[in-house]
Amino acid sequence: MDLFAIILLFLPHCAVLTEIPYNWLNLAVLRASDYQPRTDHWRGRQVYEALCKRLQGLTPHQQALCQQHPAAIPFVAKGVREALLQCQQQFQFDRWNCSSRDEVTEGPHGPFQDILGRTFRSTTREAAYLAAISSASIVHSITKGCTTGNLTECGCDSKPNLQRYAIEEDILGGQRRQRANIEQFSWGGCSDNVPYGVKFARKFLDEWEQEQFNKTKDVSHLVRKHNHFVGREAIAQNVRKQCRCHGVSGSCEFRTCWLQMPKFVEVAEMLKKRYEHFAVQVTKRAKKRLRRKDRAERGTPLRGNEMAYVQRSPSYCERNDTIGILGTSGRECKHGSYESDSCDLLCCGRGFNTRIETRTQQCHCKFVWCCEVKCEQCIEDVAVHTCK
């Protein structure tokens, strides 16, 4: 049996049809992300198309794109799962830690989990980050599938000279060094096909948002579309040109170069900095493009590194099931810290409880030639602080 035929077993039919919201983040919890596509199977495309019809939370545009590129959907699912993991990693010490109380409803093809749904459909700064990193995750995952050959409808970039790149590095004797000058080189190896990933992500996310804005004039669609662009640009603007030197005794007489996108954890970190320092509040109304709320800068278009939001964020201090906020009660904090993980900030002035836990940790680590680090296991009593 084809692996994707197995997925259908996890999407049982339901007698009662329930209208479910559009939220493609639901792909993160489907078994589709666990499997590699098998395009060599004669029934492969039929199985994928049947799966597309039963995936819940996709917009009509996403359903159509799934039908056209069914083998790409597992990579989208893997990408959004990685996006959510990185989101939780980047915000683990913030009041909003990229988690929420998700509603589970019975849809036409089984239970539907509305992952971060209220945040996903809002226009806060947190929603901006979520839109940006999920968009970037599609670009990264699809591009990686092209480069590795696991996604057969694309391959390496045949015209890397048309891509932008920010950093140039040489690989020489296993070492990497950033170059300060430009020398002759030839394109070789397998350059990451970022343009293909960007194009797919734009189709998957933006076409429906633009169509809905044209119909409803709801600015939230333009906000999400812009933040999707910010996520894509975080990858496209940070592609690296990497080169391998050839010559006698590493003289680097000639170089072979290729383009490589940044690691996804680097993208997540870049987007977190843009969330913290380059988030711009925009007006609630727009004709064709977003406008800054600050009247003095209203004529300045939003840049590709600026996230857009409309609503001010709630405090996230207290639990509020109505809007899906978990609150910070019970969260572990650091006493004496001056960062966002400090007990003063994370506990919102409510104070904290302290308990002593016995933990096993690595200690007395030593470097052993060559090339290993050996550590002992130490049992320590640790003071753990949690918010009241």
Give the positions of each predicted feature.
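Long, position-biased, composition-driven segments near the start of the mature protein
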Residues: 2, 15-345, 349-388
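Classical eukaryotic N-terminal signal peptides for Sec-dependent ER targeting/secretion
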Residues: 1-11
